[in-house]
From Swiss-Prot:
Record's protein name: FtsZ-like protein
Subunit structure as annotated in this protein's UniProt entry: Interacts with FtsZ. Probably interacts with MamX and MamY.
Phosphoprotein as UniProt keyword: no
Gene Ontology molecular function terms on file: ATP hydrolysis activity; GTP binding; GTPase activity
Organism of derivation: Magnetospirillum gryphiswaldense (strain DSM 6361 / JCM 21280 / NBRC 15271 / MSR-1)
Length: 323
């Protein structure tokens, strides 16, 4: 349905890498991007886009794009999605210039406010129309934020899911499943951001890092293109049986609710370990996940090395086409 953008060459021309961009839209999206940058994820470019000039000034992103200077004057969208939408439309040429030769774009935003709810669908549609593999990763409000904000969020999600290839939804209310009475507000949101972080890392590691089994970008596109709703999960474990424990943690992410990977049409599995990781362990982890999905699911599998993980294994799963 959509064309594939040409892939850019690395400076030394010895290998080809896809250009992957994460765009944080609005305040929550900008915070998620900052947390990803601080985690030092490799092989990704970052863009922050916001109607709030003050918040944009605090971004750590490679590129910062003010949205709707004429319609918002840099003062934000004031919880009005229609203003966020107009702001994105005003600045869409700046967005398209920044992502013009990208192969994959993750768009992250908080749903329920003005900028994220209004601007994210506009940006997603523009990216996808350019043939860019477009993934949305968004949060839904806490219950205590009220019915009006939740209604705004649900309307924005309904719009967004029609203009992205794959959409991951993280209900903030589910943070209570993993938070304790001592968990700070900042740390709680970092937990939600880790879903985005692990999902992006599971893709980039497979095409950037050396490993037993590497994937090319075409494999990833097959699993994530035009797939609708998805879930992401990452598990890390040490000790025996670390492979199985990591796999089970990856497919039981409490932040994503009660959604199961059982009905997934496509599954991307990334198994990462140190140089002590054995072929038997890779087989164990992959088979543990495979037993959870339908026999006809399209499973794309890769395994990479990370010297920092000696003694540990990390399993990441992206399951797409969730009913």
């Amino acid at each position: 349905m959509f064309g594939v953008e040409p892939i850019s060459f690395c400076e030394d021309m010895t290998m080809i890498r896809p250009r992957i961009i994460v765009i944080g839209v609005g305040g929550a999206g900008g915070n998620a991007v900052n947390n990803m940058i601080l985690s030092k994820i490799e092989g990704v470019e970052f863009i922050a886009a916001n109607t709030d000039a003050q918040a944009l000034g605090l971004s750590l992103a490679d590129r910062r794009i003010p949205l709707g200077g004429y319609v918002t004057k840099g003062l934000g969208a004031g919880s009005r999605p229609e203003l966020g939408r107009s702001a994105a439309q005003e600045s869409i040429d700046d967005i398209l210039t920044a992502i013009d030769d990208a192969n994959m774009v993750f768009i992250t935003a908080g749903m329920g406010g003005g900028t994220g709810s209004g601007a994210a669908p506009v940006i997603a549609q523009a990216a996808r129309e350019r043939g860019i593999l477009t993934i949305g990763v968004v949060t839904k409000p806490f219950h205590f934020e009220g019915g009006h904000r939740m209604g705004t969020a649900e309307a924005a999600i309904e719009e967004l899911q029609h203009v992205v290839d794959t959409l991951i939804i993280i209900p903030n209310q589910n943070l209570f499943r993993i938070a304790s009475e001592r968990t700070t507000f900042i740390d709680a949101f970092k937990m939600a951001d880790n879903v985005l972080n692990s999902g992006v890392r599971s893709v980039t590691d497979l095409v950037v890092k050396p490993g037993l089994i590497n994937l090319d970008f075409a494999d990833i596109r097959i699993v994530m293109s035009e797939m609708g709703k998805a879930i992401m999960g990452t598990g890390e474990a040490e000790g025996e049986p670390r492979a199985v424990k990591a796999a089970e943690a990856a497919i039981s992410n409490p932040l994503l609710g009660d959604t199961s990977i059982a009905g997934a049409k496509g599954v991307l599995i990334n198994i990462t370990g140190g140089m002590d990781m054995t072929l038997f362990e890779v087989d164990e982890a992959a088979n543990r996940i495979r037993t959870e999905v339908a026999p006809d699911a399209n499973i794309i599998f890769g395994s990479t090395f990370d010297e920092k993980l000696d003694g540990k294994m990390r399993v990441s799963v992206v399951a797409t086409g969730i009913a």
